[in-house]
Amino acid sequence: MLKIVGVTDLDGVVKEETIKYIETTHSLYGKFYSKDLFVGMPFCFVYDDYSGQMLRSSTICHWDYVEKDKLYIIETMNSIYYIKELEE
């Protein structure tokens, strides 16, 4: 299972307002999802700063997996999502 553990901008600055919004108004933050949602698919769910909504995004630019940390790093057009793989 996967858990979103952080969101930053492309310079690595934590997006506090984004995280706060997602934590308080959308069920995606801190919830668990199967890997299929993120890996091997051309989209993920991202917070859009302009509309203030979670959107299904097709703008993944790059993703990587850090095996020792069991951490997926997903880069979109304007954010980087850190998604931790947890034992079920």
What are these regions (language model features)?
Residues 1-67:
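N-terminal non-globular leader segments, chiefly Sec-dependent signal peptides
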